[in-house]
Amino acid sequence: TDLLASRHIGINEQDTTVMLRKIGVDSLDELIEKTIPANIRLKEPLALNAPLTEYEFGKHIAELAGKNKLYTTYIGMGWYNTITPAVIQRNVFENPVWYTSYTPYQTEVSQGRLEALMNFQTAICDLTAMPLANCSLLDEATAAAEAVSMMYALRSRAQQKAGANVVFVDENIFPQTLAVMTTRAVPQGIELRVGKYKEFEPSQEVFACVLQYPNSNGSVEDYTEFTEKAHAADCKVAVAADILSLALLTPPGEWGADIVFGTTQRLGTPMFYGGPSAGYFATRDEYKRNMPGRIIGWSKDKYGKLCYRMALQTREQHIKREKATSNICTAQALLATMAGFYAVYHGQEGITTIASRIHSITVFLDKQLKKFGYTQVNAQYFDTLRFELPEHVSAQQIRTIALSKEVNLRYFENGNVGFSIDETTDVAAANVLLSIFAIAAGKDYQKVDDIPEKSNIDKTVKRTTPFLTHEVFNKYHTETEMMRYIKRLDRKDISLAQSMISLGSCTMKLNAAAEMLPLSRPEFMGMHPLVPEDQAEGYRELINNLSEDLKIITGFAGVSLQPNSGAAGEYTGLRVIRAYLESIGQGHRNKILIPASAHGTNPASAIQAGFITVTCACDEQGNVDMDDLCAKAEENKEELAALMITCPSTHGIFETEIKDICHIIHACGAQVYMDGANMNAQVGLTNPGFIGADVCHLNLHKTFASPHGGGGPGVGPICVAEHLVPFLPGHGIFGNAQNQVSSAPFGSAGILPITYGYIRMMGTEGLTMATKIAILNANYLAACLKDTYGIVYRGANGFVGHEMILECRKVHEETGISENDIAKRLMDYGYHAPTLSFPVHGTLMIEPTESESLAELDNFVDVMLNIWQEIQEVKNGEADKDDNVLINAPHPEYEIVSDRWEHPYTREKAAYPIESVRENKFWINVARVDNTLGDRKLLPTRYGTFE
């Protein structure tokens, strides 16, 4: 019982027998044989290591963590030591209510995290002095790339006519940001022109500028005149700003920036060897429809109660597909939530104190090191100093002394040395820094006992305006109040801690505690991504081991863990394909074939990667229409770069002709990209390499047990065949910026221990059984619900894969009750809705995963059948078609206990429709939310009002 598989998989042998009988097969193997085509079944089990028990894995991960050397690091460059308030670490980061919830599409059961994300947006708007912010992007570098794409889309008619395609980038931008911007700009035909901002001259071809504030050297420049000059030439200005510095520096919004972006890692998020942390993005209100990422806004429920919702979703990939403003889907919701709570806990005074303390220590060290003969090059700075060394001192000398004291500094290519002070730097640490530079220069130094409050920030760049003035940032500064505020919010949300979340295509499985615990180890939390390799041996070993495991599971030869989400993985895979085609003289191939049933990120990613999409039809059984595929492949043969396909398809079925499909595409000289969103039906039974794909991405936050976090963090690694390995993403700081897609070399390295633990503790047998049970559970639900709702698509032998689509269109025709009404009614029973109207409009897609027990599956069936009865009551005239439990759902607590009750059905029917609800009632906070109000008037901060 100490093996994870017995805890992770919710179904035992006895349950399996009962379920197989209901499905109508004699054995689990028979079910699998009838579900997965024989020609793609693996002949041998996966050659993974034997599984570790939870206890053994705990010891193993402790050994790996012990190989990481946690030196005091002042490298900076976008990553800094922080202090995560314990109340946030324990009650948010380590709390399954926060980390197991899904993206808040279902507004009424997401009010807690919507408020937390609204706090984040408000903090960003206040600190940047911009009117609009989204609720996170993947990291600073991808935010920069998104800014460039957005400004390109916003070009004036005259600029478009003139073919303006140049972005001016100041040379003192972080190198990793420039590398990712380059990756993303090239396929869109955008040229990045790097130079000195003081020498910038506008010209007809330049449509935008990107600046860093403070810049990469740490210098704080006054960009006011530059911005005026750019605007006079109709150039937009985007600024990468250190969010903590804006407590002391004039915010870019006050000197005219059009976009302000960056990372909120400094707001209490550990460095995690590079990620995850929440990127931020703020802009002007008039650009809201071009803005990437999710935006939280105010709305009202049907009784007029104020509430939150995700606004302007029609911009996003799941609706707009190839016309979307961005391919982003999963972002960094959990980290944005934590950064928002950090702002709530500290408020303006606390954040200003932290920033001032950092700055004072920096001023003190600047003055002291000048006495030792060092020349500091930044006239104005916040936390970062860059020194020219005295003639008799070398950077190597300083490095040797620093390493002997377990300190990492920043070493510039020209021999300069620098450092960035952070929230954790105290007097003792400052004394160590003093000693390093004094010893190198052969000077005496005096230890100090105290460092006075001092500022060298000139009034031209000094902040004078207040921020975080809303009461939420001024009420919760004691731990008791903060703990209760967090609890008050988490009670409003459905997560896996409450009940099954059956979202199709999302794989909401168990995120086991044994997998999650290592994330809180200081050796994993406190590691800067640019430390010397010998200090990160534990991380490197974990990354190598995990990469080998993923190669075995997918049947591929190479892996990149850099992409921070599934959509980022899609983009990366397509960039790799493009690079390969260019290398063999086939760079003219620019078309991607995509089935009509594909996830919206597929066409959006293809467009971002500079391709043209060609849609291929599906037949009545939900398979790719082979005639249409052959015709489109032949028609576009010379220009075809790749096919993007999901297996099993988004319709939840294994296509019998998948191998033939791969062969047809390869015969055209093109590549096959497999979307790994449905990998939970493949692991151990088949794999993309065996099927015939060339590249696939995985969603570690689906198949491989990493949590969804309410909308991120995710990891979207790509796995590739041998011929594509040379084109995998590199990292500029390590000398190879080819196809770089994330700020950090290994993307969100900090959450890789989860998937590593899942694979190491499940082993071949456990992983394979998990896949079989996921398929069993989906077929069991299909068998239980087929005679009422009906199942839209089935495979060749009448079975579904790991998910199935529930037919709701006939119900709507006969009764007016929609799939949305059913989804909202499920909330009254304590369940999150399945996936609505994807991939087929007017349906619900259900994916139970392997983690649910038979008791939970049966309860869900009881609920769905009871809702079916409620639908029949409307159909038969027993219930009022204009006033019934379905169209009025969900029923919030305040309505149930109200003095007025004017519905023709009882309060009990509304709130306790079946007995099991009494044991685990989830009280909803708001009635059905008005979706149009919040879009007509977008209010993206806590200060918003409809009056």
Across the structure, where does each feature detected by a protein language model lie?
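Flexible, glycine/proline-enriched loop segments at strand-loop-helix junctions
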Residues: 104-112, 132-136, 165-172, 212, ...
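Short helix-loop-beta connector
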Residues: 130-131, 161, 555-557, 586-588
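Non-catalytic terminal extensions of PLP-dependent enzymes
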Residues: 1-22, 34-74, 83-99, 105-111, ...
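A conserved hydrophobic secondary-structure block that centers on an alpha-helix together
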Residues: 123-144, 163, 167
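TRNA-binding/sensing appendages of the translation machinery
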Residues: 25-39, 257-262, 693-696
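Conserved PLP-enzyme active-site core in the AAT-like
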Residues: 112, 142-307, 369, 382, ...
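Conserved phosphate/anionic-ligand binding catalytic regions in large, soluble enzymes, centered on
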Residues: 269-282, 286-287, 331-335, 420, ...
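General small-molecule cofactor/ligand-binding pocket signal
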Residues: 133, 191-195, 377, 410, ...
